[in-house]
UniProtKB/Swiss-Prot annotation:
Keywords: Electron transport, FAD, Flavoprotein, Heme, Ion transport, Iron, Membrane, Metal-binding, Mitochondrion, NAD, Oxidoreductase, Transit peptide, Transmembrane, Transmembrane helix, Transport. GO terms for molecular function: ferric-chelate reductase (NADH) activity; ferric-chelate reductase activity; metal ion binding. Residues 1-23 form a transit peptide. Signal peptide: none annotated. The chain crosses the membrane at residues 40-59, 86-104, 140-163, 232-255, 306-330, 353-373, 564-586, 606-627. This is Ferric reduction oxidase 3, mitochondrial. GO terms for biological process: monoatomic ion transport. The gene is FRO3.
Length: 717
């Protein structure tokens, strides 16, 4: 009887397990369907947006499309003329960003092994060829095949726009079309050219803020990070300021030649405000002047502080052209505003700094307490602010820990290279009496996912502190290997240092090096370029323990574990609230004034729109943060005051002899070390000085060895 009962129970358990498997499979299938639908919608929206941008400079768009849309939407008592651009330019991009957030949330939840089959690996490697370096130029840096393709398409859009605009200028403005008592031919054409340069500059401005929205779903959905896309912001910024400066100079020449210098101070009540445009241009020029590498690197504080003028630039740009036209280039700025305010909310709290280690190479490792539910990818960065050094300065540093291997700790390594980092090193190295250090952070920011497991082997090339992102990758692979979930690639770390004291950074690679040989296959080739023999004891590491205040919090995601879903909610709900506010104000305030033959002042309309956007973003972001803070931080302060031995200690004595070959007085011959590497897919990662990155890029460039998959990790702005 008992045996029969056990048999029934066993059958019941198998039946229950079968139901669970079927439910899980159905759930994953539903997620896949939703993701495919999102991809389809995204493609439709992108294609529609591209068509609009292509058609915008043509007469067909102005005389037929725009005229038709204004006839249907422009007379609305709720939105008026701005309603057209709200629908055509703002709405699609906000929808796209919201869909991207939902897609990333579903992708994060999916538990499918995408590297199990050879077919998947070959498919990924096929597209990996598009990431190979194609151009290595001083002005552009390292440009991949994909980047060249998109750069050419974007430049084609600008040239197409200029060609259409200039065609209108030189074909329609002729000696016969000019009034007898009006401008000369060259003056009339100069006036028209100035307008067209401004219109083309507005296209670049429309894309300017997307690369610097650090937490944007649009970047993460296409595999970009805020650091890797900073160069796009630089390219776009140079184009914006070149076109806008040319626009301003042309108008200055025109006004001087036509004796209309007083126009420079004009602030039209309902039209274009010249004075506002000049203020915006001056703010832009001040920012632009500090972005050149020689100034930015030598006077980083000047560069940092002057970039806050972007608020002045955008405010007076809107006053200059009016809100209706400004909405064309506003979607990227709107997404940036949401991201910026969320970062502001996160930065208001001090975090728990538990310990620090001071290395002999003037490098500091900071160890923070972390919420175990905060997950981040290798190579992620953290922005750090220490008020006792500077209340305003925020500096990005690579995270060296792994959120999987070290669930309660987050570490960053800071090399003493500038005023801020030198002050921090001096503060920690010269005193044993520091019990507490107030620190605020923003982030982490990094790729939504990594695909290092697809390679047969990984070769990491670093110079100096460029080793930091590779520490996080190695630790992450160590965790993956220890779980036996995937087969990890063979790792070769080629690191170049100036002095033997810099070798102490190798001590931070693993939390516990005694277990490494049983999990991953790693070889370290270290090169000390300026010394023939070791002149430093690498194991002299000073450890400081801090006593966090009760108010200090572990580093946690501002929007909780479902941050992408919350971001989609913020974007969509804030935009809806903004629309409702504008509809009410337009219906009961702006529209009645316009109807009484008194046109509403353009500056006031612009200010109302900007305030409505700000209120909607602040309100929705704050509510989302408070909702997550209430539920997510419950029970957070248990078991986080102290770090376990694994989190603080390492075993440097065993790491160097067993896995490392040290070469003194020579530089690595990268061509010899990289060319001829065996394996169908060899991932080559490089992080270090510009010359080193460019040398590796040339070796792995398009047309070279087909098995080398290049990736540059650069944190140099």
């Amino acid at each position: 009887m008992a045996a029969r009962g056990r048999l029934v129970v066993a059958r019941g358990n198998r039946s229950f397990s079968s139901i669970i498997r079927k439910y899980s499979l159905k759930r994953e299938t539903n997620k896949k369907v939703i993701k495919n639908v999102i991809k389809l919608l995204t493609m439709v929206i992108l294609m529609g947006t591209v068509v609009i941008w292509i058609m915008m400079p043509t007469s067909t768009y102005k005389k037929i499309w725009l005229k038709s849309m204004r006839a249907k939407l422009g007379k609305s008592i709720y939105f008026g003329k701005p309603g057209v651009n709200l629908l055509v330019y703002m709405f699609p991009m906000i929808l796209l960003a919201s869909l991207g957030s939902i897609y990333l949330h579903l992708k994060k939840q999916t538990r499918v092994n995408q590297f199990n089959s050879r077919m998947d690996r070959k498919k990924i490697d096929k597209f990996g060829a598009l990431k190979r370096p194609m151009l290595v130029k001083a002005g552009l840096g390292i440009v991949t095949v994909t980047e060249v393709m998109f750069l050419m398409m974007f430049m084609a859009l600008l040239l197409w726009s200029l060609a259409n605009y200039f065609y209108h200028t030189f074909v329609t403005i002729t000696p016969q079309s000019l009034p007898t008592d009006g401008d000369n031919l060259w003056q009339a054409r100069l006036d028209s050219i100035a307008v067209r340069l401004g219109l083309t500059g507005n296209i670049c401005l429309g894309f300017l803020f997307y690369p610097v929205a650090r937490g944007s779903s649009l970047l993460a959905a296409v595999g970009l990070t805020s650091e890797s896309s900073t160069k796009y912001h630089i390219w776009l910024g140079n184009l914006v300021m070149t076109l806008f400066t040319s626009h301003g100079l042309c108008y200055c020449i025109y006004w001087i030649s036509t004796n209309q210098v007083s126009q420079m101070l004009e602030w039209d009540r309902t039209g274009i405000s010249h004075l506002a445009g000049e203020i915006a241009l001056v703010a832009g020029l001040l920012m632009w002047a500090t972005t050149f590498p020689a100034i930015r690197r030598r006077f980083f504080e000047v560069f940092f502080y002057t970039h806050y003028l972007y608020m002045v630039f955008m405010l007076f740009f809107v006053f200059h052209v009016g809100i209706s036209y400004a909405l064309i280039s506003f979607p990227g700025f709107y997404i940036f505003m949401v991201d910026r305010f969320l970062r502001f909310l996160q930065s208001r709290n001090n975090v728990k700094l538990v310990s620090a280690r001071v290395l002999p190479c003037e490098t500091v490792e900071l160890n923070f307490s972390k919420n175990p539910m905060l997950m981040y990818s290798p190579t992620s960065i953290l922005f750090v602010n220490i008020p006792s050094i500077s209340k305003l300065q925020w500096h990005p540093f690579t995270i060296t820990s792994s959120s999987k291997l070290e669930p309660k700790k987050l570490s960053v390594m800071i090399k003493s290279q500038g005023k801020w980092s030198s002050k921090l090193h001096h503060m920690l190295a010269s005193s044993n009496q520091i019990d507490h250090l107030a620190v605020s952070v923003e982030g982490p920011y990094g790729p939504a996912s990594t695909d290092y497991l697809r390679h047969d082997s990984l070769v990491m090339v670093s110079g100096g502190s460029g080793i930091t992102p590779f520490i996080s990758i190695i630790r992450d692979l160590l965790y993956v290997s220890s779980t036996n979930a995937y087969k990890t690639p063979k790792i070769t770390l080629i690191c170049a240092f100036k002095n033997s004291s810099d070798l102490s950074m190798l001590n931070l690679i693993l939390p516990n090096s005694t277990e490494i040989s049983s999990f991953i296959d790693i070889q370290i080739k270290a090169f000390v370029t300026r010394e023939k023999v070791s002149t430093c004891n690498m194991n002299i590491i000073k450890t400081l323990s801090f006593k966090p205040y009760v108010s200090d919090q572990p580093i946690s995601p501002i929007l909780g574990p479902n941050s992408w879903l919350w971001l989609a909610t913020i974007l969509s709900s804030s935009f809806m609230i903004f629309i409702i506010i504008i509809a009410i104000i337009s219906r009961y305030h702006i529209y009645p004034i316009d109807q009484s033959s008194k046109e509403y002042t353009s500056a006031y309309t612009s200010l109302i729109y900007l305030l409505a956007i700000s209120i909607s973003v602040v309100a929705t972001s704050t509510v989302a943060m408070l909702c997550n803070k209430k539920s997510y931080f419950k029970g957070l302060y248990q078991n986080v005051d102290a770090l376990s031995p694994l989190m603080i200690e390492s075993s440097p004595d065993q790491l160097l002899p067993e896995f490392t070959n040290i070469h003194y007085g020579e530089r690595p011959n990268l061509n010899k070390l990289l060319v001829g590497l065996k394996g169908s897919s060899v991932g080559v990662l490089v992080c270090g000085p510009r010359k080193m990155r460019e040398e590796v890029a040339k070796i792995c460039s398009f047309g070279s060895a087909a098995n080398l998959q290049f990736e540059s990790i650069s944190f140099n702005w």
